């Protein structure tokens, strides 16, 4: 279910009263992409609506951090033929193949920049949770899963840092591969969560 601008503002107002100062927004297909307009669904916000949300939150002392998935949870991207070359699996279109680093960087550099343009926060969340298809494709099956994860996340962090932003990821997958944490950027921020 997509929240309306007014509903998000009501939520922000409630958060402000509770002295909460950060709101993470995952837009998916409701972000008003321009170069990648194929991704927008019929409920997509306009650019001015996103600016209105961010401005309102800022006026309440709430920082809006955008979450733009680039690894798992990319169904709304990978279902389109234009992005089919990035799929980890031809039938299950939820995850980007971590060996397609250069192709993915090209696409997500553009997507990240569009999202970042409307969010002054120094932080940029790239998701990376529930990448359960790691090692599914024939090429990936020959590579260690933690290696696949680390190399891909390092590449996406580079793209985030090119914009002058600090990257954030969910911590669930790296907690399954704790041996790999030393290889990830030292300034990468991990957000832990559970299924409650």
Regions found by a protein language model. Name each.
Residues 180-196:
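Aromatic- and acid-rich polysaccharide-binding/catalytic face
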Residues 112, 175-178:
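A generic local structural motif
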Residues 172-175, 195-196:
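Short beta->alpha connector loops
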Residues 1-171, 183, 189:
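Substrate-binding cleft of carbohydrate-active enzyme catalytic domains
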